[in-house]
Regions:
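Conserved SAM/SAH cofactor-binding pocket of Class I
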Residues: 1-29, 148-231, 237
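N-terminal auxiliary segments of SAM/dcSAM-dependent transferases
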Residues: 52-130
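Short SAM/SAH-binding signature in class I
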Residues: 41-47, 226-234, 264
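SAM-dependent Rossmann-like transferase core, predominantly class I methyltransferases
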Residues: 101-162, 171
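A short glycine-rich, Lys/Arg-flanked "PGG" loop and its adjoining helix->strand segment in the class I
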Residues: 57-68, 247-259
């Protein structure tokens, strides 16, 4: 029996339990909330994610897994869903104790067994075939119910690629699907930090040349054996953390490629990737510019 679970990494002021089972899909190797049996958990701490569907899904899953009388302790930054937490939990029929701390709202509830609406929240936030997208995806996954404009730009400008390659930050597999249209591609590693993205990609990309890895690109081992890499690296709102992520992707791509191998990269126009590309690659060619995005082909 799992006794204590944790979802995400709450700030230390909330005293996250050290020995709890981690259940965040964004932490490779963690246990999936979905895999926990009903009523098998004594206490749960959830650092609630910012998306509404994703958050209600995580809360409903945690409540489902809790035993009656078990405690759910949830917090979120005020402007990242925290101010809606209490209402959302009350909508499940729970009595909620709310406090404010460190720009967060924290809610404590005890499972009664009479909660309502858990199944509906789980269905709305689960992996699903997205209408109009013709793909499987899940709320919380990057651009989960649409084709990202940056990836679309890259897909439109890339030539047919050849040999062994990887898609760093593959999401639910939109770009990889286009890459695999080239018959000269012999293998493609789809890699993402988000388990939900990797699971969706596995369903979307049914191709014997594809393999799937739930991993952090920054800590991948690089063998320098790939012919090509495509990537629409994480950027979010262009904060400094995101910029560093993109820079780490570029460096890792250079390590993973063989000499002469090529990286096809799309970045938000405001992100200054040029210096990092020039430092890690022999030749960097702008490959298009439009719609707020810049494309690059970089050769090792
Ligand atoms: C801009 S999105 C591109 C997704 C996909 N190519 C698409 O077009 O839908 C970047 C992806 O990188 C993933 N990601 C973020 N940090 C990562 C990391 N450290 N290692 C691997 N993937 C990461 C995100 O989960 C997200 O799916």
């Amino acid at each position: 029996m799992t006794t204590s679970i944790l979802y995400g990494r709450p700030p230390l002021v909330f005293d996250p339990p050290g020995a709890a089972t981690q259940t965040s899909p964004l932490i490779p190797g963690s246990t999936a909330l979905e895999s926990l049996a009903d009523g098998s958990v004594e206490t749960a701490m959830v650092y609630a994610p910012p998306g509404v569907l994703e958050r209600r899904y995580a809360l409903a899953q945690a409540l489902r897994a809790l035993q009656v009388g078990g405690r759910l302790d949830v917090m979120a930054a005020k402007d990242k869903g925290g101010s809606r937490l209490k209402k959302e939990l009350e909508a499940f029929g729970l009595e909620v104790g709310e406090t404010a701390k460190a720009h967060h709202r924290r809610c404590l509830v005890i499972k009664t067994g009479s909660e309502t609406g858990l199944d509906a929240a789980i269905a709305a936030g689960a992996m699903q075939a997205v209408e109009g997208l013709e793909a499987w995806s899940q709320p919380g996954v990057f651009a989960w119910d649409r084709i990202d404009a940056g990836s679309a730009q890259l897909a439109a400008h890339m030539p047919a690629l050849k040999g062994a390659g990887a898609d760093l930050g593959c999401g639910y597999g939109a770009l990889a699907t286009v890459v695999l249209r080239s018959e000269a591609v012999t293998s493609l590693r789809l890699i993402d930090l988000d388990r939900r993205a990797v699971d969706a990609a596995r369903k979307n990309v049914e191709d014997a040349r594809a393999s799937f890895e739930w991993a952090d690109v920054r800590t991948l081992e690089a063998a320098g054996d790939l012919d090509f890499i495509v990537s629409n690296p994480p950027f979010h709102d262009g904060g400094s953390e995101d910029r560093r992520l993109g820079q780490a992707f570029i460096k890792k791509a250079a390590e993973m490629l063989k000499k002469g191998g090529g990286l096809w990269l799309v970045g938000n126009r405001h992100l200054p990737y040029e210096a990092d590309l020039n430092a890690a690659f022999k030749r960097v060619t702008p490959a298009g510019d439009g719609g707020g995005y810049k494309l690059f082909e970089a050769t090792k």
